[in-house]
Design a protein with these regions (language model features):
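Single conserved hydrophobic/aromatic residue that forms the stacking wall/gate
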Residues: 1-9, 13
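Short glycine-biased active-site loop of nucleotidyltransferases that positions the nucleotide triphosphate
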Residues: 4, 43-47, 137-140
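Acidic active-site catalytic centers that drive phospho-/nucleotidyl reactions
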Residues: 8, 37-39, 102, 126, ...
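Conserved RNase H-like, two-metal-ion catalytic cores of nucleic-acid enzymes
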Residues: 18-89, 240-247
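Residue-level signal for well-ordered alpha-helical scaffold segments within enzymatic catalytic domains
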Residues: 55, 82-85, 104, 108, ...
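Conserved DEDDh/DEDDy metal-dependent 3′-5′ exonuclease domain
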Residues: 63-141, 326-361
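Acidic, Mg2+-coordinating catalytic module of metal-dependent nucleases/exonucleases
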Residues: 138-139, 144-212
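Polyanion-binding interface signature
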Residues: 209-329
């Protein structure tokens, strides 16, 4: 449908039936959530004008957008007052880089026009703060909103640069061109719809704490864990020497290499151990008392170890206990593959959470 603005500070609604996202990462009640994006003629609230506030909200089982438009170049107080009235109905205010730009800009404008608006009762949710943490995971050159939209497959109707938008608005004020108005509205409409479409990026930090192990399968070379997760924004793949991850929708699969070889286990209280050079191992001093002094020496941090041949899997990076070290050229930290780690249970889930925490931090 065509977007129209009929008067100064006009309200323009558009129904949205084509966006389905999981908003539970923000609230279990979609009606509590307000998405917003602003359009201005500059970055400084003291030296520029606010000409459009786009709002997205859930109503009657659908997302809708509302545009508060400064149609005559003089209606900033009116659209700000309407915005202040509108946000009072919501508990969460969702934006992209809004904590840095949109909200401070609006606060300054509210002060300029002496408009009473408190953000104390509404919680800001800035998706940019989450998406920037996963720039490397998704191999992004930048984390602009449009880059994140590309990952979820969102397609804009038009793309107009910021400078072009400002010129279009100034020209609209002179001519009242319906084509320019349509461009201005469509761009902001895309901003709001795009913002809604990337909501599920907020689920990424929840993965570690909320995943559940569904299945465990084992081959000679790998162990594969299948887990349920919160709704994911897009397919996620990750590969390193210690694990491979493939995740999509509400499921994550992690493939862990299995190795059978001899590894070293180091005793932390090395001062209580003696090293036996002939056997290339350390034993506790209570046992060393029965060993001839010519066949033993006090252990150091480097020699206070025993060697065990078993089946191992990589240890999480921050795991400190029961660590075995590869004696080969590649090195590495490992855990013994116990029965608990090959069956569904809390030990397995904790292991998976610890392994993937380096990815979904």
């Amino acid at each position: 449908s065509t977007l129209l603005a009929s008067s100064a500070a006009s309200d323009v609604y558009k129904r949205q039936n084509d966006i389905v996202v999981d908003t539970t990462c923000i609230s279990d009640t979609p009606d509590d959530i307000l998405y917003f994006d602003i359009e201005t003629t500059g970055l400084s609230a003291n030296r520029s004008d606010l000409y459009l506030i786009g709002l997205g909200f859930y109503d009657d089982d659908h997302f809708k957008t509302l545009f508060l438009f400064n149609d005559d170049g003089c209606s900033e107080p009116e659209i700000l007052a309407r915005f202040a009235n509108h946000i009072s109905r919501y508990r969460y205010l969702v934006s992209y880089n809004g904590d840095t730009f949109d909200i401070p800009y609006i606060r300054t404008k509210m002060q300029q026009f002496d408009i009473d608006c408190s953000f104390d009762n509404i919680r800001s949710v800035d998706i940019y703060k989450t998406s920037r943490r996963y720039k490397k995971l998704f191999n992004m050159n930048s984390v602009k909103q449009i880059d994140v939209e590309d990952l979820v497959g969102f397609q804009r109707k038009i793309f107009i640069s910021g400078g072009t938008l400002i010129n279009a608005y100034k020209e609209y004020l002179k001519t009242g061109s319906s084509d320019l108005l349509d461009d201005l509205m469509t761009h902001n409409h895309d901003d709001v719809r795009g913002l809604i479409s990337i909501t599920e990026f907020l689920n990424l930090p929840r993965i570690c704490n909320e995943l559940e192990t569904l299945d465990v399968s084992r081959t000679d070379d790998f162990i594969e864990y299948t887990c349920s997760t919160p709704k994911l924004p897009c397919r996620i793949t990750y590969s390193s020497p210690v694990m491979r991850i493939n995740a999509n929708d509400r499921q994550l699969r992690i493939l862990i290499p299995v190795t059978q070889k001899t590894m070293k286990f180091y005793f932390k209280d090395y001062k209580n151990y003696y090293y036996l050079p002939m056997e290339d191992m350390a034993i506790h001093k209570s046992m060393a008392a029965y060993v001839d002094s010519t066949h033993k020496e006090k252990a150091t941090k480097e020699t206070a170890y025993t060697q065990i041949t078993d089946v191992f899997i990589p240890a999480p990076s921050h795991e400190k206990n029961n660590i075995f070290y590869d004696t080969g050229i590649n090195g590495g930290r490992f855990l013994r593959l116990s029965d608990e780690l090959t069956s569904i249970g809390q030990v397995t889930t904790q292991y998976i959470q610890n392994m993937i925490s380096v990815v979904f931090h």
